[in-house]
């Protein structure tokens, strides 16, 4: 495809339509619009509400997680707590850098047009991509920690410690920051406020360079393709180990069918596998569309444009990807009784305080 078309697609701003204009246009021209445009306009309308609501909910949930988890009342080890707090902290950063400082200004350009005056878009991109990488690889690190705890009993006491968790998390953070420095040279400092994967203007040299396209392609291979493969592999091995161990334990206890309800070890294993699969499965499901679309986009710029993916697929991918940053902790709270109770207590506290003040 002609490179000029690529420039036009990736370096122009959106027309800054408001929610009302999008809605009225879709209603007035619904019958005459092709399906692809119907879907794209529909998702743009949804995003006007979706992103602000998600920002508020995600910000609150992750702040609560950072406050509650370190108190040690959720029934998990200090090592696991380290990982969960780190995941909540990086998810909070993604919410700030991606939702609040990127997606919301894109959809509310009239109210937030002053964002264009800040020429720090490439620095913003470095911070956002580094935070995103940390969020993804912290999930991988947590999955590997649970794999070691369940499948490698001899190494469990050495690896599954608070100190090791701190070293792993620190190393991942440093590598993620170093890995994403190249965005400073690919992107410019000017914001486009366009609803595209890149929210900064891109120079012609980058658009026409297969070298830069290959570097960006490699970036998406490292995150999230490799994490996908690692999480699937580790979960498969871990699940097999838990199932075999549980079966052997049932036989030793003389239970031919079903779990013994009075067996605390079986309950602990069941909780472990639920937590592991829900958090990592949530990551896989919510990142799948974004990963496929990102890989296709880079193949398109490398010249492989035989397969067409509609633009609304990109919208779906972005919406699900940012949703993943708000769900890990919420899912954890739903699957762990003690943690769920802590969140309930915090949620009830303001109302309890108000009632006490009223009674006075």
Language model regions located:
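Helix-loop boundary elements of multi-pass alpha-helical membrane proteins
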Residues: 63-83, 144-167, 261-276, 338-346, ...
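Seventh transmembrane helix
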Residues: 227-231, 274, 282-286, 291-292, ...
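Loop architecture of class A 7-transmembrane GPCRs
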Residues: 26-37, 108-131, 178-226
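Extracellular N-terminal segment of 7TM GPCRs
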Residues: 1-61
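Extracellular TM2-ECL1-early TM3 structural module of rhodopsin-like
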Residues: 40-52, 79-142, 149
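Fourth transmembrane helix
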Residues: 93, 97, 104-107, 131-141, ...
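Intracellular effector-coupling site of seven-transmembrane GPCRs
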Residues: 83-84, 89-90, 201, 240-290
């Amino acid at each position: 495809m002609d490179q000029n078309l690529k420039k036009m697609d990736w370096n122009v701003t959106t027309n800054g339509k408001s929610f009302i204009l999008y809605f009225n246009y879709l209603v007035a021209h619904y019958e005459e619009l092709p399906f692809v445009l119907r879907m794209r306009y529909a998702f743009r309308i949804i995003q006007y509400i979706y992103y602000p609501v998600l920002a508020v909910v995600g910000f609150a949930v992750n702040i609560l997680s950072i406050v509650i988890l370190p108190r040690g009342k959720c029934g998990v080890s200090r090592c696991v707590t380290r990982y969960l707090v780190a995941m909540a902290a990086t998810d909070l950063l993604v919410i700030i850098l991606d939702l609040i400082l990127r997606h919301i200004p894109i959809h509310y350009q009239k109210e937030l047009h002053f964002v264009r005056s800040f020429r720090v878009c490439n620095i913003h991109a470095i911070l956002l991509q580094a935070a995103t990488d940390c969020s993804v690889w912290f999930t991988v690190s947590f999955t590997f920690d649970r794999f070691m705890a369940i499948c490698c009993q001899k190494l469990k006491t050495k690896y599954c410690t608070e100190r090791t968790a701190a070293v792993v998390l620190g190393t991942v953070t440093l590598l993620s920051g170093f890995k994403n420095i190249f965005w400073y040279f690919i992107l410019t400092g000017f914001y486009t406020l366009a609803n595209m994967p890149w929210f900064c203007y891109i120079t012609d040299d980058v658009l026409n360079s297969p070298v830069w396209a290959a570097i960006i392609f490699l970036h998406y291979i490292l995150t999230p393709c490799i994490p996908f493969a690692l999480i699937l592999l580790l979960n498969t091995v871990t699940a097999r180990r838990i199932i075999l161990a549980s079966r052997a334990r049932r036989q030793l206890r003389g239970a031919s069918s079903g779990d013994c309800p009075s067996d605390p070890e079986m309950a602990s294993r069941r909780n472990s596998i639920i937590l592991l699969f829900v958090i990592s499965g949530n990551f896989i499901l919510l990142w799948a569309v974004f990963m496929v679309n990102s890989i296709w986009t880079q193949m398109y710029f490398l010249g492989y444009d035989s397969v067409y993916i509609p633009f609304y697929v990109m919208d779906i991918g972005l919406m699900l990807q940012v949703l993943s940053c708000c769900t890990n902790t919420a899912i954890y709270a739903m699957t762990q009784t003690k943690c769920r109770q802590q969140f309930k207590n915090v949620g009830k506290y303001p109302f309890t305080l108000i009632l006490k003040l009223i009674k006075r």
